[in-house]
Amino acid sequence: MRKIQMKRSQTMSTIITHRQFPHYHKYTMDLAGRPLTLEVGKLAELANAAVMVTYGETSVLCCVTAAARPRDGIDFFPLSVDFEEKLYAVGRIPGSFNRREGRPGEKGVLTSRVIDRPIRPLFPHDFRNDVSVMCTVMSVDHDCSPEICGLIGTSAALAISDIPWNGPVGALKVGLVDGKLVFNPTSEQRKVSDLDVTVVSTGKKVVMIEAGANQVPNDVMFEAIRMAHEENQKQIALIGQMVAEIGKPKFDYPHADFDEELFQKIVDATMDQAKAAMATDDKNVREARWNQLIEKWHQLFLEDYPEMDKYLDEITYKFQKKIVKAWLLEGHRVDGRQKNEIRPLAAEVGVLPRVHGSGLFTRGQTQVLSVATLDTLSANQKLDTIWEETEKRYMHHYNVPGYSVGEAKPARSPGRREIGHGALAERALLPVIPPVEEFPYAIRVVSEVVSSNGSTSQGSICGSTLALMDAGVPISAPVAGISCGLIQDDDGSFTTFIDIQGVEDFHGEMDFKVAGTKKGITAIQMDLKNDGLTMEIIKNALDITYDARCQILDQIMLPCIAEPRPEVSKYAPKMITMHIDPDKIREVIGKGGSVIQKIVAESGAKIDIDDDGTIHIASPDAESCAIAKKCIDDIVFVPEVGQLYYGRVVRLMTFGAFVELAPGKDGLVHISKLADKRIEKVEDACKVGDMMWVKVTEIDEKGRVNLSHKDAMKEIRAKEAAGEIIK
């Protein structure tokens, strides 16, 4: 039998040629100088829609599915968004025990939230069918963001699917490199960029902004958002073409049940009591009053409407929103504040006695206790993900226990909201954290929300600043955060208001969070419940949040602590940083780590060594650090020709004396170099244990060191005659 051999490339091409994809379509465009391709009809045919997005060499498969029937007994839209990070996308095997990807990492959770926020408001408000969005990262080119691919692919998949949705949207990142705004910056550009803002928009409005920035001014941030919105129209046009050519008709769905007649009767009968119940700055009082009002509704209407209880949550929401909206459009708020008035503020540092730094920030009934901890760089968080970042030196974690909102519920591991808010505060402080060369510590801040009534994420930003300054971390500038809300009337007029509390967040249309210094913005996160923001609203929000954060800094934070403590806490580890020749690292570590383990045992210090020869020594006390440094200095010591050293005589020979310059490092003083005059015996000039000055005169090709006591003393006498002090 004749054996037929076929090359791999021939086999693959045969498979592709003979496999039929009758519904396959491919759409391409140029996006920021790189090719963007959207493919439909080749993968995941059983999903409502699936789009493979390829941008450069980054590939993300975006699939959307919807349940055929609505979920019973719920008053919310059950949307789930998952961003799956596959390590094969970057050519790596997971480091877990079973070598499988586990639960999503922090960056995966944050990207899921970035995709969720712009698409959620565009679903019908009474849609109750489960909808799943899954973006699987299959290949990563670090010059082309998987996050942007996920946003574009999700938009395209929802738009061409039969799922009711009022898209499409376009998405773009903007950087600031050498003072110029850059669309979708490359990996190298991101490393030097002062801005990383993701902007998602529809054909007319902006629906999502997520930003980290190095104290960027308002006008630069606004211009980046405006330019991104305009550029997004190209993607929207391409997806519009896809919808026209291959889009499916949207399916009909049962609209959420609601008794409008009952609602109107309740409004007419109890409007005055409802306004009285809402008009307070105390969350607990408001809720107690409203519960009493519900009892009155039962007395008035339960007999005629026996099923009214199933509508109570929706009635409460609509009724409260009606009141809050009317008041805000008239220029006042539920707690009596003006629209740009901040709730009462308080700040305190040094709250906890033995921690490295702590800060308590209070704004109305929102209260956050932030605690800073310093450790050696070995405590940096190691990251095993598809992203370029491999470790984090500054970490912020955010916790919201049940008692903070007056609820009796058990403690749970952090959810997506906690991870998202923690990352926002982390991003807000990152630009002012000192570089590792100036402050060689790993830094962790934990923000405990002990009372929650709106804007807790912004409270954690202010609390983090206080805790870091109390810990002696030399941040370059204090950072404050504030949120801005929005109410729009049917005629398009709008009102923005500052420092939203819980009830305003719940019933408002926007939560526009902005953090920064007096110099500029460090972070933005925008959540919406409407169909988007105009440029006028965005500019207004940027302006009023700047004024508000400056007010917070000037009135409460800086009077509390004007600048970072001059030294770290006495309970924080003491740190020394030194640099050695990288070729000497092996000598410091020793065979099997024997040398460094001995140094650690003798000194009690903790030692971290970088590949570039940077060594960080940490210990609870300075003496241990000094001992460890001395040991390392001795190991890496290399004598220099022409230099003077003060050493101990360790051995006598007939031809000279050996003098120890450092432990294990000695040189020979020939008998002719021991004294100014001729001597017959070495013992006539010195004995073992004597200390003497020597000068390095030569280091031969074998590394042997030749010394001279005679030359050293001659140089010392000359320096003393010139008035120099010899140490």
Could you describe each region identified by the protein language model?
Residues 571-573, 582-727:
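Single-stranded RNA-binding regions, centering on S1/OB-family and related RNA-binding modules
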Residues 125-131, 166-168, 235-253, 284-285, ...:
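Flexible, glycine/charged-enriched surface loops at secondary-structure junctions
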Residues 117-125, 160, 351, 376-379, ...:
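Conserved helix-loop functional segments at active or binding sites
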Residues 162-278, 468-566:
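Mobile "lid/hinge" segments at catalytic clefts and subdomain interfaces of large enzymes
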Residues 14-25, 31-34, 48, 59, ...:
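Alpha/propeptide regions of enzymes that mature by internal proteolysis
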Residues 35, 47-132, 137-144, 203, ...:
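Glycine-rich, flexible beta-strand/loop modules in the N-terminal catalytic cores of phosphate-handling
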Residues 49-52, 144-162, 349-372, 453-473, ...:
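Conserved phosphate/anionic-ligand binding catalytic regions in large, soluble enzymes, centered on
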Residues 11-67, 252-388, 573-587, 595, ...:
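Extended amphipathic alpha-helical scaffolds
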